[in-house]
């Protein structure tokens, strides 16, 4: 199964790209993050439908902010949209930061359950430690956990449980959760992960992030007689921008 991760980007009045880490906190303070999440969800569904015309075995990871879960009005809009597109639930994975997922209040937990009841699955990213309770996560609908490869391989990582990082994939698998090693940027990392039984990887090594075409835009033109492709700027999205952040590679090594 090929999957894409969407990352939102904004443009300022000088047409400069603003990364999520630079605007999310401001958007949350201004009460705009829910609107951004809603727009990104719509874009994810548009692209997912486009991809599924050619390949049904495809999936998309879509980030959702904790503030969106906490705001009943904003969440209601998102839920209505996801309800209308619940046929895509098996292919649309909603992603939350580890720190946010650990600190969900009553309202957020109820909203999360509403999404799970409609068939949506969840992913955890921005993992900073391996204090993971697979049973609890599985009960809440988590089916993927993205752990930085460096964290898995760090010999100085303090033991957070009785299980070694090399056994984490097997432990999660018992509860129906797939471990994804992310931020893989070199072949050496792939080799080092072979003993960890990691079935999925994400990172620049597999595919760098790239902008998506606006909905309805024609595909990029073929190279001309001189072998030159059209300028990349012709393929850029208007704000907010979503980028595919490395297709997940099935099996880090082994026969294809």
Q: Model-derived features: where do they sit?
A:
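EAL-family c-di-GMP phosphodiesterase catalytic domain
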Residues: 9-13, 65-72, 92-104, 120-256
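Short beta-alpha junctions and helix-cap segments that line functional grooves
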Residues: 20, 108-111, 133-134
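A conserved signal-transducing helical linker
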Residues: 27-31
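Surface-exposed amphipathic alpha-helices with a cationic face
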Residues: 48-52, 83, 109-119, 166-173, ...
């Amino acid at each position: 199964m090929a999957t894409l991760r969407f990352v939102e980007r904004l443009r300022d009045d000088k047409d400069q790209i603003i990364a999520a880490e630079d605007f999310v906190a401001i958007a949350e303070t201004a009460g705009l993050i829910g609107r951004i999440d809603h727009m990104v969800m719509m874009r994810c569904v548009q692209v997912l439908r486009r991809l599924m015309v050619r390949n049904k075995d495809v999936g998309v990871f879509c980030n959702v902010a904790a503030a969106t879960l906490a705001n009943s009005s904003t969440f209601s809009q998102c839920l209505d949209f996801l309800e209308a597109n619940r046929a895509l639930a098996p292919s649309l994975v909603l992603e939350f930061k580890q720190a946010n997922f650990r600190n969900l209040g009553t309202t957020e937990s109820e909203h999360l359950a509403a999404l799970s009841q409609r068939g949506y699955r969840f992913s955890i990213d921005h993992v900073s430690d391996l204090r993971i309770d697979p049973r609890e996560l599985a009960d809440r609908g988590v089916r993927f956990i993205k752990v930085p490869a460096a964290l898995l391989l760090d010999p100085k990582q303090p033991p957070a449980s009785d299980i070694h990082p090399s056994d984490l994939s097997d432990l999660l698998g018992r509860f129906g959760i797939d471990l994804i090693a992310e931020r893989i940027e070199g072949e050496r990392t792939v080799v080092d992960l072979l003993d960890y039984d990691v079935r999925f990887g994400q990172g620049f090594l597999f595919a760098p992030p790239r902008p998506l075409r606006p909905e309805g835009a024609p595909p990029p033109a073929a190279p001309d007689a001189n072998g030159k492709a059209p300028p990349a700027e012709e393929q850029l999205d208007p704000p907010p921008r979503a980028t595919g952040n490395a297709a997940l590679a099935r099996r880090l090594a082994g026969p294809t």
